Amino acid sequence: MKEIYAIFGGNFDPIHYGHITSAEKLSREISIKKIILLPNYGPPHRSKTKTSIIDRLKMIKFAIKDNKLFTISYLETKKNTTFYTIETLKKIRKKIGYLQPLCFIIGEDNLNNLNIWKDWKKILSLSHLLICPRIHIKKSNPKLKKWISDHTTKNSNLLHKKPFGFIFFSKMSMLNISSTAIRKSYYEGKSACGLLPSKIDKYILSKNLYKIYNQN
């Protein structure tokens, strides 16, 4: 079987154990060789992040230091540029070729909103979708139900045999940690050290990153 590369995008504002531990669990579940963290300057379908990309990148580097599973992509870190997943996947495909199995990791909540993404149906022509379960998720989007069902597999071996085209729902339990809750804790003068690496906690406190609370 061919080795899988996976892309894990997000604001990472800040990156925390929920991100890292969940990704590590996924790598063990379906034998992922490399996870590419894809921090974005600000996704087009969400309100813009308040923390600079420079600070977020520094925190990501703290989180993955000496962890060979992870690497960072800077494709979506450019200022004043709108990034769409479909365009980023095309760029990554040009770099790694079309025979390499590739998974794009998203949460179950994002899957239910996939129909608002640009050219969302074409995503499976470039990668698999690897879905992380979410607690208290809303019912599935009826507009997507059949499409999801038609492309879902329970056989993780197919993710290795085919370079793209499938949706796979992880069976792993994920840590229920929220970046929003972490930002709120720092805004209220509390530490969230148990939810993220101590170096990131110290960095946040030294830079006063979340003095202004952003709930998005």
Swiss-Prot record:
Gene label: nadD
GO function terms (MF aspect): ATP binding; nicotinate-nucleotide adenylyltransferase activity
Cross-referenced InterPro entries: Cyt_trans-like, NadD/NMNAT, Rossmann-like_a/b/a_fold
One Pfam family linked to the record: CTP_transf_like
Keyword NAD attributed: yes
Keyword Repressor: no
Function in brief: Catalyzes the reversible adenylation of nicotinate mononucleotide (NaMN) to nicotinic acid adenine dinucleotide (NaAD).
Organism encoding this protein: Buchnera aphidicola subsp. Schizaphis graminum (strain Sg)
SUPFAM superfamilies in alphabetical order: Nucleotidylyl transferase
Signal peptide extent: none
GO biological process, one term: NAD biosynthetic process
Pathway(s) the chain acts in: Cofactor biosynthesis; NAD(+) biosynthesis; deamido-NAD(+) from nicotinate D-ribonucleotide: step 1/1
Record-linked PANTHER family: NICOTINATE-NUCLEOTIDE ADENYLYLTRANSFERASE-RELATED (PTHR39321), PHOSPHOPANTETHEINE ADENYLYLTRANSFERASE (PTHR39321:SF3)
Catalytic activity, EC: 2.7.7.18
Name of the protein described by the UniProt record: Probable nicotinate-nucleotide adenylyltransferase
Similarity remark: Belongs to the NadD family.
Keyword field: ATP-binding, NAD, Nucleotide-binding, Nucleotidyltransferase, Pyridine nucleotide biosynthesis, Transferase
Catalytic activity: nicotinate beta-D-ribonucleotide + ATP + H(+) = deamido-NAD(+) + diphosphate
